[in-house]
């Protein structure tokens, strides 16, 4: 029995080792930048990593300017990710959510997707239970932005 357990454990370790990327290719939070490279509406997406002198790290994708990960030290100094995010661009594209979105036409809901401006009633698309949420189904959080990593602390 011990022999089978040891063989199974060894096999599991070998399989795990075969699938791991070198640590230098991953972000501090364990994200693989290659999993954020795709094309959306003829524009290239990517993952950008910012770091400060204190060791904090922020990962942002140019797909909607979404914050994917923020690594900060906990009370014991251990780095922890404080963002609820996905580990690939595919999930941000295919799972209906606004996770990490830092940009949009507006925040929250417009009741029944309708408002009055200068006496005219404006009807917006209803994308959330009869209401218009965060700019509608094609809000700015779904656009791909041009980005340029100037240095480890500056993204433009």
Predicted regions span which residues?
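Small/flexible residues
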Residues: 4-5, 23
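Sec-dependent N-terminal signal peptides
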Residues: 5-13
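C-terminal motif of bacterial Sec signal peptides marking the signal peptidase cleavage site
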Residues: 15-17
């Amino acid at each position: 029995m011990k022999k089978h357990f040891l063989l199974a454990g060894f096999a599991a370790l070998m399989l795990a080792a075969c699938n791991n990327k070198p640590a230098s290719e991953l972000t501090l939070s364990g994200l693989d930048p290659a999993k954020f490279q795709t094309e959306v509406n003829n524009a290239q997406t990517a993952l950008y990593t910012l770091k400060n002198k204190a060791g904090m790290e922020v990962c942002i994708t140019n797909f909607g300017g979404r914050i994917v990960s923020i690594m900060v030290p906990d009370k014991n100094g251990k780095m922890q990710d404080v963002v609820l995010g996905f580990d690939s661009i595919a999930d941000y594209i295919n799972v209906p959510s606004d996770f990490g979105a830092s940009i949009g036409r507006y925040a929250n809901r417009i009741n029944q997707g309708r408002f009055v401006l200068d006496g005219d009633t404006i009807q917006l698309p209803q994308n959330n239970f009869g209401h218009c949420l965060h700019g509608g189904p094609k809000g700015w959080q779904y656009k791909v932005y041009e980005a340029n990593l100037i240095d480890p602390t500056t993204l433009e």
